[in-house]
């Protein structure tokens, strides 16, 4: 059967770019309310963007992700805009093509490889802390959360780390620009830069991931320029925005949750597990799927050409999957959250984001154990397919640089 949703349903107006914010400036109250409705109606129809399905239940999202025949990753970004003759490699592809391309970059993102960045991340984090520790104030989002992943991603791709603002603008076009024309215009800038980088790396390859991909072959054939542009785009996107928004939300939480902060300071061995629980609660991403054939999920029948938006933050609060889902429980194990995806498209950098968060939290709490939200400035939540805190102004006792 094809279910219908009452006009009073929260699903009807659900829009990841315009999520209602609560008194704390976050959408978490709305997430909980939609979760409550999803307990009886896990999938609903939203009128936003010409109409699309909102999938909110944990098992329903799993069902969509696992059914790669009926749901294509060509709908991963929504609303969609024209990206030219290439795709968002891996994230915007389906198997068997997806698998072949993913294998090219799987090794640099393995736990063994990403653990090697720990010391580099530690140094980078402390350099950033040094830049403001004598001031006693700063925006933890722009000062730390944006910069930590941007610097590492630039190094991985062989880009100048100091051009982080440019990279974030390109990423913004994919995850936060609602206007398709504006998004395509900014995206064209990214493409032009990628073409220049690819041409340079063909003649002067380095040790970075882009050089590795450029010099690789699939079925005996070198990758086309369009494929390489797609690779550059998805590696930039996955490396910068998701981690930045997650870390921003974590700093925001630690600024006011004194009990959690002091517990992690007293027991730093809990930080790795806390990172996973914070990922469950503040996972930044939602993804779309394009329906390619008629399919029924639960009691909802979807038609070819429709889009299904997977609301991971709602599934991460599903009471059938998690005990006390509205609370941060850092001892939670196992923690089968969906914040990093599921199945064949599980986030390639899943281990890297954990390493980045673990190092950032550990080093920050060592240097600045006491801090709070700045009462004279406003925090700001960013909505979109990648959501999280955009500004987190904090104050803290002035300290000394490590170099002194």
Swiss-Prot record:
Lineage: superkingdom: Bacteria
A biological process from GO: carbazole catabolic process
UniProt site positions, description: Controls regioselective substrate oxidation: 242
GO molecular function: heme binding; iron ion binding; oxidoreductase activity, acting on paired donors, with incorporation or reduction of molecular oxygen, NAD(P)H as one donor, and incorporation of one atom of oxygen
Binding site for heme: 73, 98, 102, 289, 345, 347
Family annotation (Pfam families): p450
Pathway note: Terpene metabolism; 1,8-cineol degradation
Residues reported in the UniProt entry to bind substrate: 242
Catalyzed reactions: 1,8-cineole + reduced [flavodoxin] + O2 = 2-endo-hydroxy-1,8-cineole + oxidized [flavodoxin] + H2O + H(+)
Record-listed E.C. numbers: 1.14.14.133
UniProt KW keywords: Heme, Iron, Metal-binding, Monooxygenase, Oxidoreductase
Swiss-Prot/TrEMBL cofactor(s): heme
Family: Belongs to the cytochrome P450 family.
Miscellaneous notes: It lacks the conserved threonine believed to be involved in dioxygen activation and instead contains an asparagine at position 242. It is the first isolated P450 using the flavoprotein cindoxin (CinC) as its natural redox partner.
Assembly with partners or alone: Homodimer.
Role noted for this protein: Involved in the degradation of cineol (eucalyptol). Catalyzes the initial hydroxylation of cineole exclusively at the pro-R carbon to give the (S)-6beta-hydroxycineole. Cineole is the natural substrate of CinA.
UniProt-recorded name of the protein: 1,8-cineole 2-endo-monooxygenase
Organism of origin: Citrobacter braakii
């Amino acid at each position: 059967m094809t279910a219908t949703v009452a006009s009073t349903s929260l699903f009807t107006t659900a829009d990841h770019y315009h999520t209602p914010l609560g008194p704390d400036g976050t959408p978490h109250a709305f997430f909980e309310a939609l979760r409550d409705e999803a307990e009886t109606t896990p999938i609903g129809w939203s009128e936003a963007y010409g109409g699309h399905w909102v999938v909110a239940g944990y098992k329903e999202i799993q069902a969509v992700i696992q059914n790669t025949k009926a749901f294509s990753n060509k709908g991963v970004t929504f609303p969609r805009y024209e990206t030219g003759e290439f795709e968002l490699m891996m994230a915007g592809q389906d198997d068997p093509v997806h698998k072949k391309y993913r294998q090219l970059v799987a090794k640099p993102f393995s736990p063994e490889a990403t653990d090697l960045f720990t010391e580099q991340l530690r140094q980078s984090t402390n350099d950033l802390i040094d830049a403001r520790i004598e001031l006693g104030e700063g925006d933890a989002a722009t000062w730390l959360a944006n910069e930590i992943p941007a610097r590492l991603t630039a190094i991985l791709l062989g880009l100048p780390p100091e051009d982080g603002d440019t990279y974030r603008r390109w990423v913004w076009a994919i995850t936060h620009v609602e206007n398709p024309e504006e998004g395509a215009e900014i995206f064209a800038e990214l493409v032009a830069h990628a073409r220049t980088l690819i041409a340079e790396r063909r003649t002067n390859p380095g040790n970075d991931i882009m050089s590795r991909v450029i010099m690789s072959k699939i079925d005996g054939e070198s990758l086309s320029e369009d494929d390489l542009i797609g690779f550059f785009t998805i590696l930039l996107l996955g490396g910068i925005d998701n981690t930045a928004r997650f870390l921003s939300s974590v700093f925001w939480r630690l600024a006011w949750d004194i009990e959690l902060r002091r517990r992690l300071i007293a027991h730093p061995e809990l930080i790795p597990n806390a990172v996973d629980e914070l990922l469950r609660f503040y996972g930044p991403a939602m993804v779309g799927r394009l329906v390619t054939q008629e399919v029924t999920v639960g009691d909802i029948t979807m038609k070819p050409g429709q889009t299904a938006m997977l609301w991971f933050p709602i599934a991460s609060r599903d009471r059938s999957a998690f005990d006390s889902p509205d609370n941060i429980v850092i001892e939670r194990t196992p923690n089968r959250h969906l914040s990093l995806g599921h199945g064949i498209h599980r986030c390639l950098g899943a281990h890297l984001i954990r390493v980045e968060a673990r190092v950032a939290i550990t080093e920050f709490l060592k240097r600045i154990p006491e801090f709070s939200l700045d009462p004279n400035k406003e925090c700001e939540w960013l909505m979109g397919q990648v959501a999280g805190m955009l500004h987190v102004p904090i104050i803290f006792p002035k300290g000394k640089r490590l170099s002194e």
